[in-house]
């Protein structure tokens, strides 16, 4: 009798957790929500993924590069255009890696990055937020860039 109860309990636990896994196996799960990003994003097998190489701002009309916020907005705008041209959206972005350098006065403008970033993520238009890394480095390959960003996107097949 005790073995039968143990077997039934084991089957109940397996069925419960098995069904929970099946319920989330077809969706991207975001957990650990913070103000600007999630701590964890789980992408199930079968999801489509897209990786976009590191990119930075384009020079403005006057030839200058702009400050950190302007460069961040410019770079994410370019990503938005690229994603949309391939049938993806900013909501599909699951990871952002940003590499930044100090500006002309030796200060890293993290607030400027966040200000530009917040125009694209966690908004009414795009409530989604990716996981994110922001790393200060010694230099970037393009003189004048303050930021280089790379992204990864994922979505479930339509």
PLM regions and their residue ranges:
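N-terminal secretory signal peptides that target proteins for export/translocation
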Residues: 1-4
